[in-house]
Amino acid sequence: PVLCSYLLNRKSTDKKVEKEAWVARKLKELYGKALNGALIHKKIVLGCTIGLFLIALGTFFTLGRSFLPPFNEGSFTINVSSLPGISLEESDEMGRRAEELLMQVPEIQTVARKTGRAELDEHALGVNVSEIEAPFVLKDRSRDAVMNDVRKKLSTISGANIEIGQPISHRIDAMLSGTEANIAIKLFGTDLNLMFTVGNQIKEAIQGIPGLVDLKVEQQIERPQLTITPKRELMAQYGITLPEFEEYVNVMLGGEAVSQVYDDGKTFDLTVKTSDESRTTMEDIRNLMIDAGGKKVPLSYVAEIRSVTGPNTINRENVQRKIVISGNVSERDLRSIVNEIQQKVDASIQLPEGYHIEYGGQFESEQAASRTLLLTSLMSLLVIFLLLYNEFKDAKESGVILLNLPLALIGGVFILKLTSGEVSIPAIIGFISLFGIATRNGMLLISHYTHLRTVENVPLKQAVLQGSMDRLNPILMTALSSALALIPLALNGDLPGNEIQSPMATVILGGLLTSTFLNGFIIPIVYLLMNKEDKE
């Protein structure tokens, strides 16, 4: 206001009003004719708009659902895993074979591989797992086409499970479900062998679902193990308590840190344990001497030592044993694939008593985020209504302004259907932002109608016509400026860094288009109908 008082004097403003641009004059002329026609055929206009809204609402429920849109990170992260227990040499050879196949893809110029990771690494891996980073440069093919080519080539490696993703996407999946895949089917139970059998049955049941790729069951093999079971009666005869026995076995076989040594600025644990030569064979372990009331006796006197087989790993969640059947999504939305998985599992898998399945990964996060955003959007609508009511002091006028929300929803839904065909979390955030933006146009019209009727004493219908014409330019200018700012984001969704912004911009752009166009007809019609009593 201060700048306007200095820069816009009355004389120059009057000249500009007299010399209104021909585009604005033409638009007002066309809009005036269209608005008069709409006011004559109110029922037809309202009926068509309601029909559009119902179609958009039905279309919304047919759209696919996903947590986040696919990222374009410019690099593939590929996990090549075989059965635990494979030698480092065999795993390295398998990794080299994968590298050779990757280099046959034209878009990939270089690869980098890690086979296994150190035990103290924050993401420790056995030597049976190779992690390959393969940067790519897109040429004539899309990212999905290149990924499918990579997947097809690597599927020729026998005895290997392949997972293909991208660096950040892999980390997100790992944080969400503990597995580096989009979908994690978690099977909980007690018997690991039975769980592994049921897990393979689930894999076979869902193997042919379109769009489900990189399907695998968590690797489990039986490995030789040594069990040492105390003989309690003999321990009592020799005067050995159970805590003493447990500490002895831990120290002799596992070692115990008793102090620390500083050397050259570094700290090392001083560990007490038996020598490696003294525990090479089972017979060596049987002959280890244990203190027994002032004398020593062989360990085999007071314990049963047996060689058995057991699982290489036991994973738990909330104290329950679990195995994971994991998979990725390709060229299809996440929600529909998970729904089909649930249908096939429910129809073909009979779970033993005490066993149950949970679906995790991006699907679980998408459901939780959608519920949170739905609650947030309802709260925001309530706040918007209260603010409008506080300003206009009229529930009817506040309700008329909120009619812009379904008008905006129409464009947002249709533009999603024409572009990605999926509703992701960024798209939902776009809808919430759109609802706030869309109320602006209704406020401009209603506030001007009220001013004309109360201050200038203009009759109802004339106030609606004149107010709509007066506010045409401001509404179009604000909508156009917002749209022009959003177009670059909406059109460049494939560029790295724009993947999340693009769905939001697309939804807002489509909603602005329909809300701006329909706002100029629906708000005047509804305002006129709701104020008939005042006119009479």
Per-region residue spans from a language model:
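C-terminal transmembrane helical bundles of large multi-pass transporters
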Residues: 153-533
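Residue-level recognition of strand-loop junctions within catalytic nucleotide-signaling folds
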Residues: 83, 116-117, 137, 273-275, ...
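Short beta-alpha connecting loops at secondary-structure transitions
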Residues: 15-19, 83, 429-433
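Signature of alpha-helical transmembrane segments and their immediate interfacial
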Residues: 17-69, 109, 156, 160-161, ...
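Solvent-exposed, membrane-proximal periplasmic/extracellular interface segments of envelope transport
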Residues: 89-179, 233-255
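Hydrophobic, well-structured modules enriched for small/aliphatic residues and gly/pro motifs
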Residues: 1-12, 425, 435
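Short, conserved charged micro-motifs
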Residues: 87-90, 140-146, 194-197, 332-337
